[in-house]
Amino acid sequence: TFKDIEKKIFEYACEMAREMTRELLEKYDRDLMVVRDKNAYRSKGKRHTTVKTIYGEVEYDRNVYEVKRDDGTHEFVYLLDEQLKTERVGLISQYLAEQLVAGITEQSYRDCAEEISRTTGQSISPMGVWNVIQSLGEAVCDDENKLVEEHKAGYIKGKEKAPVLFEEADGVYVNLQREKQDKGGIKVGIAYDGWKETGTDRYSLDGKVVVAGFSNSKEFHEYREAAIAEKYDMDETMIRIMNADGAEWIKNVSDPDTIFQLDPFHRNKAIKEAIPHPEAIRDIHEYLDRQDIDGLFDFLDAYKNSISDDEEMERVSRLITYFANNRDGLLPYTERGIKLPANDKGLVYRDMGTMENYIWSIIAKRMKHNHTSWSI
């Protein structure tokens, strides 16, 4: 059948690719041996190794050299790896590792392993995929910690200038496996310098910086600040605005001058969940539209005193407390008379509140589908 022909040709192509890769690597390694600085690199023979690629395992030999460093220590190196800037995760090639990462964001470890094994020339087990992801995750954590330390030391300074920096943060819970708790909270943050017009009444965020992690609030904010500083020159930023749901871990940001606004989506959701009567909901929004915050609280107190149902009274009490804890942020920044400096790139300033879309695209779509559970 055509399927059989297709499969045999694919297998043959993978076999040829493995042989071509072996020949190319070994020839390049021989060339490096000839042109090397023989005084600096003392040959210590060849070593056999294997690299797992998208077209299967490639076995080849490469020369190892002894090098004496300036501090007098001796080190063994592979010139071939140095010249090719070889990056691996164990025996997995960088490109194959990237395919595994792309697959695991949408699939389980088992499905990802089956997909890679079926569509490439490389067979891999679910545990093999897990090991690769763990190794990459540890490397990412090391890079993040290094960035935070460099930021604390004052070495991080981005090149982009943003007179106004818009920031949003939120959290989402995902199922955990083999952990003491059933669910774990992932913190997500995004920063951008404005909106770019992409069409008639169509806009996109400009200069996005997105961070996410299971870390505690202190560690999350430290990394968030470092990631922002890596892109933006914070000395040029005059105003920072944070849009969030009012959670304490979000409001305790590093910059005390950050302007906070309660995310309109969460604000309106809280109103709808606490108030069952459409007329009362309309009245609440009218107070907000008139920017009459004192009148809003008077109305909520009067509404609470007018009801007799204990459960509804409790819900209204929680709403009043929620609004009281976020009183300064009940109105969006656009309704507070805040004068924002113009952006040199011609960006526009609009209403904030994109976090829910990013929660879905960054976390929920990848980590909450198919009842998936995760370990941390």
Model-derived features: positions:
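Catalytic center-proximal scaffold of phosphoryl-transfer enzymes
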Residues: T1-R22, R69-I376
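Basic, low-complexity segments
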Residues: C14-L91
